[in-house]
Design a protein with these regions (language model features):
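Sequence-structural signature of mature extracellular/luminal beta-sheet repeat domains
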Residues: 1-321
Length: 321
């Protein structure tokens, strides 16, 4: 079936009727929102090398960490600790190129991983975590590839004993970006977004074994030739909420075929619709609020918020989903 992506809306039961998509706060180039049980939203300001916080109902933001190691994707693990992908988007010395975990109660920061086979990571981008403590993160290079020590863009697993295992790499995938789990934690979803002509713009699904090994690779959705997905979230029914699209073509390698918004897609690849957001470029999305029905969307310079009908699933509040 051919879909006219520019005319797709969401049916009743997904986006709350009359709910505006409103700016929560505006900064620079934003990524990786993560929302605590109390409602505090952590998000990355990559360009200014900071992790910021936003309190709903309060104008503006607070600085949580500066410098942040060019932090990108953020996630609260099953114990409510803040996982951070410290990247290298600018190809300079401020990029941490590592995974860290912060105990928000004590402020203690722990380096979980900074290399593989003795070589520094490219630029950790996004992260997912199981309730058993396993952590999965993507490590692409979207910046200066001459800074790479590794010769591949891959997905890794950090086990509770601290060991690091490469679980996905080229040629099965090209440029891993957003990553998430299904509510039962048995499916791993991966955004493979390679912005070159004929590069992947796919959402992959993998079966995930108890020990954290992915298998059974299959396509959920292909956004080609438009701007594919970046980050994503999952609701309690298993639907994917993918930040994707762009309002105008960047050239033949990334066309304007996919308009910007949060694309709601079932695990079987059925497009339920789109929450339109006019700003380029949407980067990531998460659920928050008392009822997990508040959606926070990071974009080029604005953190947006809107309301949805189906509560989200996040690992640190899995008992509520």
């Amino acid at each position: 079936m051919t879909i006219d992506h520019h005319s797709v809306g969401l049916p009743a039961g997904y986006h709350t009727a009359e709910a505006d998509v409103a700016p929560a706060t505006a900064v620079a180039f934003l990524e990786g929102p993560a929302c605590t049980v109390e409602g505090l939203v952590y998000f990355s300001d990559i360009a200014n090398n900071r992790i910021l916080t936003y309190t709903p109902g309060v104008e503006g933001f607070e600085v949580f960490r500066e410098p942040s190691g060019r932090a990108n994707g953020l996630l609260l693990d099953s114990q409510g600790r803040l996982l951070a992908c410290e990247g290298n988007e600018h190809g300079d010395d401020d990029g941490g190129r590592r995974m860290t975990r912060t105990d928000l109660a004590t402020g203690e920061v722990e380096i979980l991983a900074d290399s593989f086979d003795g070589k520094r990571f490219n630029a950790p981008n996004d992260v997912a975590a199981r309730s058993n403590g396993q952590i999965f993160f993507t490590d692409p290079c979207y910046g200066d590839r001459t800074t790479m020590e590794l010769d591949h863009d891959s997905v890794y697993r950090i086990d509770t004993d601290g060991s690091v295992t490469r679980v996905l790499t080229q040629p099965e995938i090209q440029r891993p970006n957003g990553i998430h789990l299904s509510p039962d934690e048995n499916t791993l979803y991966l955004v493979d977004s390679c912005p070159v002509i004929d590069g992947n713009r796919k959402i992959w699904a993998f079966d995930l074994s108890e020990d954290g090994t992915p298998s059974g690779q299959r396509v959920v959705y292909d956004f080609s030739p438009g701007r594919g997905g970046d980050g994503m979230a999952v609701d309690s029914q298993g639907n994917l909420y993918i930040a994707a699209g762009i309002s105008r073509s960047r050239g033949p390698h990334e066309t304007g075929d996919i308009p910007p918004g949060i694309w709601v897609i079932t695990p079987d690849g059925d497009v339920k619709g789109r929450i339109p957001i006019v700003e380029d470029v949407l980067t990531n999305v998460t659920f928050g609020g008392d009822d997990l029905k508040t959606l926070y969307v990071a974009s080029g310079k604005t953190l947006f918020t809107t309301r949805v009908e189906i509560p989200g699933w996040v690992v640190h509040r899995r008992a509520e989903s």
